[in-house]
Regions:
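Hot-dog-fold acyl-thioester-processing enzymes
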Residues: 1-83, 145-149
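Short structured motifs
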Residues: 1-2, 86-92
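Short C-terminal domain-edge/linker segments immediately following a structured domain
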Residues: 46-51, 89, 134-139
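N-terminal start-of-chain detector that recognizes signal peptides
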Residues: 60-63, 73-78, 93-98, 110-113, ...
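HotDog/MaoC-like acyl-thioester-processing domains
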Residues: 1-13, 96-149
Length: 149
């Protein structure tokens, strides 16, 4: 069913597609973003310590999580004419080749104003072990019909 502002409630869940992370997908994101940081490409470099952290191998770009969340929100909102307006995220755990991650969201609140209607969504990306790898908050606008005002 297409999401409409009126049929949404706090607690409703939005599920995004699963994404299998591979060395190739990490490399493709490097190419797309022009970010060739050794964090994402060089296993030997990543065996060193970064402060108190040792990653033990390459990790996926955090912004790749951002893209997966954006895709989920856009695919959910667009059929209803809604617009993904804001996304704030925090990376909480590294993602490695071989992980399968999936974004999801839970509607936190909705609000109607004179000019538009807004939905606030708590978002999370989890790996195959159900560990959170990214968390955040998104805002989606369900514009009022301009012809009815």
């Amino acid at each position: 069913m297409t999401a409409t502002f009126d049929n949404l409630s706090a607690g409703d869940v939005i599920d995004g597609p699963k994404f299998a992370v591979s060395r190739e997908s990490i490399r493709l994101f490097c190419d797309a973003s022009l970010d060739y940081n050794p964090l994402h490409l060089d296993d030997d470099y990543m065996k060193g310590n970064f402060g108190k952290t040792n990653f033990g191998g390459i990790i996926m770009h955090g912004m790749n999580n951002f893209g997966l969340i954006s895709r989920m929100l856009t695919e959910w909102a667009s059929p209803a004419g809604a617009i993904h307006r804001r996304l704030e995220t925090r990376w909480v755990k590294p993602v490695r080749p071989g992980d399968t991650i999936q974004p999801s969201g839970i509607i936190k609140a909705k609000q109607a104003t004179e000019k538009s209607r807004w939905v606030l969504i708590d978002v999370v990306v989890k790996n195959q072990k159900s560990e959170k790898v990214a968390t955040g908050e998104a805002m989606v606008e369900f514009p009022r019909d301009l012809f009815c005002q």
